[in-house]
Amino acid sequence: MSPETARPFIDIHAPVAQALAAGRPVVALESTIITHGMPYPDNGAMAANVEKIISDGGAVPATIAVIGGRIKIGLSDGERESLAMTGDAMKLSRADLGFAVAQGRTGGTTVAATMIAAEMVGIKVFATGGIGGVHKGAEKSFDISADLDELARTPVIVVSAGAKAILDIEKTLEVLETRGVPVVGHGCETMPAFWSRQSPFRAPLTLYKPEEIAHFFRTRVALGLGGGVLVANPVPENHEIPAEEMAGYIEAAQKAAEALNVTGKAVTPFLLGKILELTGGRSLKTNIALVENNARLAAEIAKAL
């Protein structure tokens, strides 16, 4: 779908439209973290605060979602709160974004769907928590997130805390390399692992300043290389849960998912919910902290572009 033919299906929130028209920095935000990633009311409060962080950082936030079949680029306070309370929202990626629009449905946009919508309107920077990737046991289940293909195809900078730690990070990095997606550790030479600052794997590339990341992206665009850039930004040290501790929680959550035969799109929300329970709420606090940290960096990158 080209941007021109997509416009009749898109509603751009007035502050976002004004910023785009004036060439001011805009940062996209996804909405599955609202609809599927956190319980209410934490999800709504988190989303509002992340938008404020981006605004305070000198950029305009644009939370992306599908509401009643309309692709929303930026939400009003009422729309954001209503989405946070929606119990039956779809989880939308490239495969079902068009379905939700055609059927008048409401859904949270994954990394992939958010990248698509952002690129349609010219937003080049997007802050999220963690990307999807290769699930553990994918050699049997073939459960690999569409986020990875979208990163290879859509020219958007995605600021994350790496891949979600419930995934097979090593295989996720291998797929990203195969698909030609640059993975940049922000100020780190080791890949972060979502709730934890370090994983056993090296960051393929390292840059230290938002201006360097912006320059790298502009250079890729000028060279016609296509696709996005994944920025891996470690969670602040005072909020991390060490990887050794998280490993036990993740293993227990995965065993519970297997016992209940949880599959497909239900896997990630189930695992996140189980880990929230096992950590006594600590994982949620860390998740919120890392999203806020990514929003701050994304605002700086957007200003540098």
Swiss-Prot record:
Gene3D superfamilies: Indigoidine synthase domain. Binds 1 Mn(2+) ion per subunit. SUPFAM superfamilies: Indigoidine synthase A-like. GO terms for cellular component: cytoplasm. InterPro entries: Indigdn_synthA-like (IPR022830), PsuG (IPR007342). One of its GO terms (biological process) is nucleobase catabolic process. Its cofactor is Mn(2+). The active site is at E30, K164. GO terms for molecular function: hydrolase activity, acting on glycosyl bonds; metal ion binding; pseudouridylate synthase activity. It catalyses: D-ribose 5-phosphate + uracil = psi-UMP + H2O. Pfam families: Indigoidine_A (PF04227). The keyword Kinase does not apply. Its EC number is 4.2.1.70. Mn(2+) binds at D143. Keywords: Glycosidase, Hydrolase, Lyase, Manganese, Metal-binding. It comes from the Bacteria. Substrate binds at K91, V111, S145, A146, D147. Homotrimer. HAMAP family: PsiMP_glycosidase. Belongs to the pseudouridine-5'-phosphate glycosidase family. Catalyzes the reversible cleavage of pseudouridine 5'-phosphate (PsiMP) to ribose 5-phosphate and uracil. Functions biologically in the cleavage direction, as part of a pseudouridine degradation pathway. This is Pseudouridine-5'-phosphate glycosidase. It comes from Mesorhizobium japonicum (strain LMG 29417 / CECT 9101 / MAFF 303099) (Mesorhizobium loti (strain MAFF 303099)).
